[in-house]
Each structure stands twice: as C-alpha cells, then as structure tokens.
Design a protein with these regions (language model features):
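Hydrophobic ligand-binding cavity/cleft-lining segments
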Residues: 1-45
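A short, structured loop/turn motif at beta-sheet edges
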Residues: 14-18, 70-75, 96-106
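Hydrophobic pocket/interface hotspot
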Residues: 20-24, 31, 55, 69, ...
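Residue-level preference for beta-strand/loop junctions
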Residues: 3-5, 49-51, 61, 89, ...
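Glycine-rich portal/gate segments that line the openings of hydrophobic small-molecule binding cavities
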Residues: 12, 42-86
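Beta-strand/loop substructures that line and gate deep hydrophobic ligand-binding cavities in soluble
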Residues: 82-134
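Short, surface-exposed coil-to-beta transition loops
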Residues: 6-8, 63-67, 89-94
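Short alpha-helical
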Residues: 29, 64, 115
Length: 135
C-alpha cells in the first residue's frame, strides 16, 4: 500500500472550544452553513454528535462526497474520513482544538490522503491549504 501524504495547517478562530465543538461535531450535518464551497449537506446515517454518523456534502451540481465520523474526543479532537473526491483514493481529516484564550482557539487540521495518480497530490496540497483558510 502506498504511503499517505500529509498536510497540516493551523487556524486561529475567535471563539471558544465549546462553540467550535458545537459546530464541528454536534452540528456535523450543517457544514454548508460555514463552508463557502458547500451548496448543501445532509445527514444520511446516525445522528449529529455521535461517532459513526455520516453526511453527504454537495459541491456545485456535479460533485458530492460522503464523510463519516471516526473518532471524537469532546472539545479536543474530531477525526473523519471522506469518499468521492475526484482523483483521491483515501482521505482522512483530524481537527484538534487548543484553547488560546477566553474567545480564541487554535484549530489544527491534518489531512492524510492518497491520490490517483500520485503526482496529483502535489497540486492538491496547495489547493487544500488555500481553501482551508477561506472557511
């Protein structure tokens, strides 16, 4: 099996960990509210706020992806996997939260992924990092 590529970026958010956790995990199916590239999202399995829940996200009229919650440590870490990205065989994302102040949190986002063909990973990394800072 080919090695997964890794991309990490840290984003400072002007909100406490509780507010961020509420949006990331307890409102998992509502990513379209804050992610500008998502037209729609809906829960297809389980319930918001539980491990194993699944959502489908629609990007434009032709692309959709399915995401599953793999792991959740309340107020600290959320891990998901995704399927349906063109040219991507495997992708997993981990969101780690660190409180910086009363209304300031660092969100460390780590993606691990494998593309087909492998050369696509180089171009994908640049695009992913840029898009993350627009959310």
């Amino acid at each position: 099996m080919a090695k997964l590529k890794s991309l990490q970026t840290d984003i400072r958010v002007n909100a406490n960990r509780e507010k961020i956790w509420e949006v990331l995990f307890n409102q998992f199916s509502e990513i379209n509210i804050y992610h500008p590239g998502t037209n729609d999202s809906r829960l297809t399995k389980g319930k918001n706020g539980e491990i194993g829940c699944q959502r489908v996200c629609q990007f434009g009229s032709k692309m959709s992806i399915t995401e599953n919650v793999l792991e959740a440590i309340p107020l600290e870490k959320l891990a998901i996997d995704a399927n349906g990205f063109p040219g991507v065989k495997d992708i997993m994302a981990t969101f780690s939260l660190r409180q910086l102040g009363a209304e300031s949190t660092e969100v460390a986002i780590t993606f691990r992924y494998r593309t087909i063909p492998a050369i696509l990973a180089m171009f994908m990394s640049r695009s992913m990092k840029k898009n993350l800072h627009q959310v």
